Amino acid sequence: MPILAPAELLASLSRDQRLLGLDLGSKTIGLALSDVSRTIATPFDTIRRTKFTQDAELLLAVVDKQGVGGLVLGLPVEMDGFEGPRCQSVRSFAANLARLRDMPIAYWDERLSTSAVTRTLLEADSSRKRRAEVVDKMAAAYILQGLLDNRSGFA
């Protein structure tokens, strides 16, 4: 299935399917799940990256177990709107994943997601260790929640 616009992704889902948000980093992949009504994003897990095949296997196991019907990948667009090498890495990951599973995928601008989450954790007086444990999956939830909150603005 091709990469879809966010509105097309939401329209492609059946009533009881969830969305899985991904924050792709070089060392980890943060995961967040929507509820079945696709209203609330919840931090779910963090995958330690190894090889693509192993990462994809773990990711698709979550997709199957949690009733996921589509993926939302954070796209790390630079502040000036330029898509640098990190964006290309996310797009390559999505293309490779699409070869393994016919599943709708959409991108969502993730600018400042990790910064916003880190700031929230600092304000909550979380320890450095605790921040390191949760920042990736919370960033994934921030990305997914952004898409869920903005669906009324889709054309």
Swiss-Prot record:
Q: Does the keyword Ion transport apply?
A: no
GO molecular function: any one?
nuclease activity
GO biological process terms, alphabetically, are: rRNA 5'-end processing
Q: What is its EC number?
A: 3.1.-.-
Query: GO CC terms for this protein?
Result: cytosol
Residue ranges spanning the membrane: these are: none
| Cysteine pairs bridged by disulfides in the record | none
* InterPro entries referenced in this protein's UniProt entry, alphabetically: RNaseH-like_sf, YqgF, YqgF/RNaseH-like_dom, YqgF/RNaseH-like_dom_sf
Main localization of the protein described in the UniProt heading: cytoplasm
Stretches assigned to coiled coil: none
Task: Give the function comment from the record.
Answer: Could be a nuclease involved in processing of the 5'-end of pre-16S rRNA.
HAMAP family for this protein: Nuclease_YqgF
Q: What is the designated name of this protein?
A: Putative pre-16S rRNA nuclease
Which species expresses this protein natively?
Answer: Paramagnetospirillum magneticum (strain ATCC 700264 / AMB-1) (Magnetospirillum magneticum)
